[in-house]
Amino acid sequence: MRNAVIVDSVRTGLAKSFRGGFNNTRADNMTAHVVNALLERNPKVDASMVEDIILGCGNPEGAQGHNIARNVAVLSDLPIETGGVTINRYCSSGLNSIAMAATQIQSGFYDCIIAGGVESISTSQGHTNMHMYVNDKLAEEVPGIYHAMGTTAEAVADRYNVSREAQDEYALSSQQRCAAAQDAGLYDDEIIPMETKMILKNKETGAEKEVDVTVDRDDCNRPETTLDGLSSLNPVFNPEGGSVTAGNSSQLSDGASVTLIMSEEKANELGLKPMAYFRGFTTVGCQPDEMGIGPVYSIPKLLDSAGLTVDDIDLWELNEAFASQVVYLSLIHISEPTRLGF
């Protein structure tokens, strides 16, 4: 089987949903912008070499529906022959798109694919088609499948004894590390600035107006966060006795990211140095009402298939949306905080 390599990866800044710079920007326009930037900074890769775009999208309907991946291919500087497919595995949709691209390259079906993810919560949340949305049998027998993610985070905290203090401490550490990375310019090379128009709303009158903005950095993190501030926040999903707050949960954000993936042979032919090699991917289902603990089961499966152990991995990224999930996962698998990405 061939090696699949990641050659380059770019993204927009992450903007606060509804209140940030992308609150009036279509998801397909965001993504086409970063696709073009990816092509521009890799001139050895002719656009005609890109055979497909695979995009993950957690809510692929409305303004980000109609097979957004194909729309992006046509909107961008790629030729009409480049295909596009949109996949949905909710929060891991973008990751799954990269895995899908890599495995197709490993299998020899493709040489060069652009894969990534996009989400415009500003233009999609509240605009979902709710016609026949709930399956009555599922709702009765497995109600957790329709729970809000924050409700599942509360279930994890409750069932596995993850304290409010541990969640807030992790959240503070995450904010501090993110701020340090921004200050050190560690994100600068991957973020592609984008000029767009956002909607500003007057809080007193409700009047709205469009203003020109440039999104060139992440604006969702809060560098000024303190432990006292976190501990003062009220629980959101279970006001009576819960522990999941706005401070120890991920924010809602808008943004797009794309990655250039190709066979190692093609990269060598073009004189391109890989950033990384794709080594494996797996999935394991768990009870829907505690969906955030999936990595408890998928990590051992993936390591076993690769013949590795937890200690063989220098840095882990547990990309979960709630501190309760990350704290529990790290207790199970990763005992050294310095080896855990934020």
What are these regions (language model features)?
Residues 1-15:
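N-terminal amphipathic/basic leader segments beginning at the initiator methionine
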Residues 10-13, 24-33, 44, 169-269:
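N-terminal extracellular/periplasmic Venus flytrap/periplasmic-binding protein-like
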